Amino acid sequence: MATSGKQYGLILPQKRASKSAPLARPSVFGDDSDDETSVGESLQKEAIKKKMMKQTRLEMQKALEEDSTVYEYDNVYDDIQKQRLESNKKLLGGEDKKPKYINQLLRAVEERKKEQERRDERKIQKEREAEGEKFADKEAFVTSAYRQKLKERQEELEREKREAELEAALDVKKQKDLSGFYRHFLNQTVGEEVVPDRSAQSEEKATSSAAAERSPSPESTANRRESEAESHSDDDQVDVKPAFSKTTANNHAKRQYRQKSPLSDSDDGDERERERKEIKEKSHKDRDRDRAKEKERERMRDKDKHSHRKEDRGGDRRRERDREEDRARDRRDRDRNDRHGIRDRRNSSPKDRERDRKGERDRRDNSPKDRERDRKGERDRRDNSPKDRERETRDKSPKDRRDKSPKDRDRERRDKSPKDREPERKGERDIREREDNKVDSQRKNQEDEKSSKSKTEHGKEEKLVEETENSSGAQQEISKFAKRSSDQTVSSARERYLARQLARFASKSYVEKEED
């Protein structure tokens, strides 16, 4: 048994021993000439070429012996191409494949385009009716393309009308009796219509759909609707569905149309036609309404977005406007206060200022601390000499005496001697006279003020207008944060306050009693 050349186990690669190159031995005649070696090489090449040519010739002879037409390419090329096409058809699985859904989609697109054109035409017609006789004198231009379009539209309407009439005539649901249904039975029994086989039904459906896709004529649509009507009627009776050839179907459709034409011409047919048109118009209106609602929703969405953006911008503008109004209002108030201060300062006469100062002095004298101090001085005066008492009574204001209670006055009268009472009575008399003089002078001053105010009122108003214009021009130059109150405004405000207090005190007809 011969051992196989296959090895098993661990095989380690072994380096083959490299063949030692033959050493070039130096030749005595090496450099003489190379003619002999070159002639040998060329002879060797020629021999190899002759050998190859001889071998190819032998192979060609052998092939020709086997098949004489092996080298006739032009004659065989057409057959080779046919074989290639057949193989490709087998691989692809049949002839050219036709699209399944695109024809229906294209048909639906065409219908939608036509509906849109009709809507546009109605809209244009309404606009023309609204215009009335406005452009009646103008010349109307109609192109040939538009005329062609109108012609096609008219043909389309007529075709739809014919289809609707045919459908109304052939539809079992729209017929009063089952005469059309039984006519199919009669035609099938007589032999005018061929009863289709159940097995060939699917194939015929496929062929009819292909034919309809190739040429969507009104007759094919009528056949399809007729077959649908028959299928509805056959569900009640038998499971026989009529599918017949194209010529017989056309003849039958024409015959049925002729038979049912009296019914379509009658009032009942007109009523059905009207109902169908109303349903169609209603569907168009619903579609238009849905589109209008969708557009309205889109518009409202865009409006909401814009309104949100506008509200943000409007809020910023409103806040900025409020700030500007507040600043302008503050500026106006300051200008008004400055004008009033200037007017009051100018209106106040020297007499008013003197009266304000006197009222300030009296108010200081009437403070609680001063009254307490006066009481202490009264007690000290009892212990003092008659001269001091007389001086104190002279210096003392009538208001202090008025402030004393009746008990204190009686006690003082009892304590005093007759000699002491005489100078006191004189002092009281002088004080009363002084008070009367003061009240008279105040009344005179008030009357003088009223008369002077009434006289100078007109002149002051004119001056005030000029001064306010000048002051407003100057105040506009003043900074917003500048100090508005000056020494003059403060003093004028104080003087006015004192004048009011003094007038209030003078107008009182009673004396306020102070409790101990």
UniProtKB/Swiss-Prot annotation:
Q: Which residues carry this modification: Phosphoserine?
A: S33
Please list where the region (Disordered) is annotated. Answer: 1-43, 111-137, 151-170, 188-494
Q: Which InterPro entries match?
A: Nsrp1, NSRP1_N
In Gene Ontology terms, what is a biological process of this protein?
regulation of alternative mRNA splicing, via spliceosome
- Asked whether the keyword Electron transport is assigned, the reply is no
Compositionally biased tracts (Low complexity):
207-221
Give start-end positions of Basic and acidic residues composition bias. 222-239, 271-466
Name the coiled-coil region(s): 100-176, 358-401
Q: Which UniProt keywords apply?
A: Coiled coil, Phosphoprotein
Report if keyword Coiled coil is assigned. Answer: yes
**Which family does the record assign?**
Belongs to the NSRP1 family.
Q: Which PANTHER family does the UniProt record give?
A: NUCLEAR SPECKLE SPLICING REGULATORY PROTEIN 1
Q: What is this protein called?
A: Nuclear speckle splicing regulatory protein 1
User: Which species is this record about?
Assistant: Danio rerio (Zebrafish)
Q: Which gene encodes it?
A: nsrp1
